[in-house]
Amino acid sequence: MQFGRICSFLDPGFEKGVPLGKVTVFAGESGAGKSYFAAGNIVKSAQDQGIFVVLIDTENALDEAWLQALKVDTSPEKLLKLSMSMIDDVAKTISTFMIDYKAMADEERPKVLFVIDSLGMMLTPTDVDQFNKGDMKGDMGRKPKALISL
């Protein structure tokens, strides 16, 4: 099943929508409209098809009024909005959710869509530790490894 018809000029592969059961990433410059696109099109379309949405906001940018203006149903029956910034927290949350989800009988399992806005803003424990110590040199390999394991 696919949802959220996307303009084919973005990518011909999305002409039929975003496929369920797959990881889809939207990349672009800051301010390009990725959050608007994900919330206004993908989340709304998923909800219209009865899909429960878990929206993980790492930027604290997706407030309820903005989502409602995009016609996203923010009621707890349709949307679980979480604010977190650590990659480890996101991974643990998804893992815990999936354990509980798999424990349900097949006929009771709702379709679920996870949206993470934004991968680029997530932090590793080392990022926080270095920031607290005033060490801003960074380590380019740490974050990609953590994201791959996510």
Model feature map: region roles:
Residues 1-77, 89-99:
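The Walker A/P-loop phosphate-binding site
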Residues 4, 84, 88, 145:
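Conserved phosphate-coordination/catalytic loops
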Residues 22, 79, 110-112:
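Residue-level recognition of the N-termini of beta-strands and the immediately preceding loop/turn
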Residues 58-60, 84-85, 118-119:
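Short, ordered loop/turn segments at secondary-structure junctions
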Residues 74-85, 136:
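Conserved P-loop NTPase mechanochemical-coupling segment
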Residues 80-91, 125:
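Post-transit mature-domain signature of plant chloroplast proteins, especially small thylakoid membrane
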Residues 93-150:
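P-loop NTPase motor core
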